[in-house]
Regions:
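Eukaryote-biased, non-catalytic alpha-solenoid scaffold regions
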Residues: 1-318
Length: 318
């Protein structure tokens, strides 16, 4: 309780005060024991995810920043006390903590061992996969610096392409870089493939990428992006914003998929959900002429199949 009283003031956590005191006054074993206690506190979730090979969660939900700081602190402390032989065990046990990965890569770069650094970067990125929820972004950028020094333009383009497709990343700077690097005569085909190879889309990503597609006048790419994001609460608003850039065929394809989703929803929906379904029907009705016609046909279908649901019929008529 006394320790909590210190923590509640938010000036400094007592563990940090205790560690600072031990760092100055305690012998090495006492200080390391204190560090190990803190490391253990942050270790359980990390080891569980590594054992289950849940690296998507390891990089997106649990960044383990505090664990990483403590491990680097321990490694540096061991070195200053001539106990470098103990650090290999730490590096192996916690080799997937992002800070530990970066520590190894940065050391190799500081020593001028670029080939070894590239191998370490590739090995680390491979663990998390191309789409590293931003965890792999700094390693891709380090790799780009090395490749640029070697004038390896093709692989620089490939790294920027991999960065563009990442989840939760600002894609705009990477599109601009790619536009500078890719030959003008190859750009049209390249950018169409680029827009078609984005594995995860959020609402923000959807808006950003759709705006890029419109700027590049590659309107045929809009359908896939909107389809990938069609379970979003904002799907109708987004379709309405970009529908007029799409071909009538693509407008119809998107509308039919939304109608199919609504049809499935209606098959099990309770009365409290009717308002949301009817709101989507009304929204799709106003998006474009193609969706308007298809929605009118769907409303007739709903009236025929669910005419015995007065609450739903009342909302539709209103």
């Amino acid at each position: 309780e006394k320790m909590e009283a210190y923590d509640d003031y938010c000036l400094c956590f007592f563990d940090h005060i205790s560690e600072a005191i031990n760092f100055r006054l305690a012998d090495a074993d006492t200080y390391l024991a204190d560090l190990d206690k803190q490391i253990k506190h942050h270790t359980y979730e990390y080891k569980r995810l590594v054992n289950d090979e849940n690296f998507d969660q390891l990089s997106s939900l649990f960044r383990f920043e505090e664990l990483g700081k403590l491990l680097i602190k321990k490694i540096e402390y061991l070195r200053t006390h001539g106990r470098e032989n103990e650090e290999d065990g730490i590096m192996e046990e916690y080799k997937y903590v992002p800070d530990v990965c970066s520590f190894k890569i940065n050391e190799l770069l500081e020593k001028g061992l670029e080939n070894d650094a590239l191998k370490e970067i590739d090995k680390t990125i491979a663990v998390y996969g191309d789409d590293g929820y931003n965890t792999t972004e700094p390693w891709h950028l380090q790799k780009i610096e090395i490749l640029e020094r070697r004038n390896d333009k093709a692989n620089v383009i490939e790294e920027y392409r991999r960065l563009f497709r990442q989840f939760l990343v600002d894609k705009r700077p990477y599109l601009e870089k790619l536009k500078e690097l890719v030959a003008k005569e190859d750009w049209d085909d390249f950018v169409v493939k680029l827009f078609g190879d984005i594995p995860h889309i959020t609402d923000d990503d959807c808006i950003e990428v759709c705006n890029m597609i419109v700027e590049e006048k590659k309107y045929q790419c809009l359908l896939k992006i909107l389809m990938d994001n069609r379970m979003s609460f904002s799907r109708i608003e987004l379709f309405k914003k970009y529908a007029h850039y799409m071909s009538e065929k693509d407008q119809a394809t998107y509308t039919e998929h939304v109608i199919d989703d609504l049809r499935k929803h209606l098959s099990y929906a309770k009365s409290k959900s009717y308002g949301y379904i009817v709101d989507d029907i009304k929204g799709m009705y106003t998006c474009c002429e193609v969706s308007k016609k298809l929605i009118l046909d769907f409303v007739e279908e709903v009236e025929y199949n669910y005419g015995n649901r007065p609450a739903l019929m009342r909302l539709l008529r209103n």
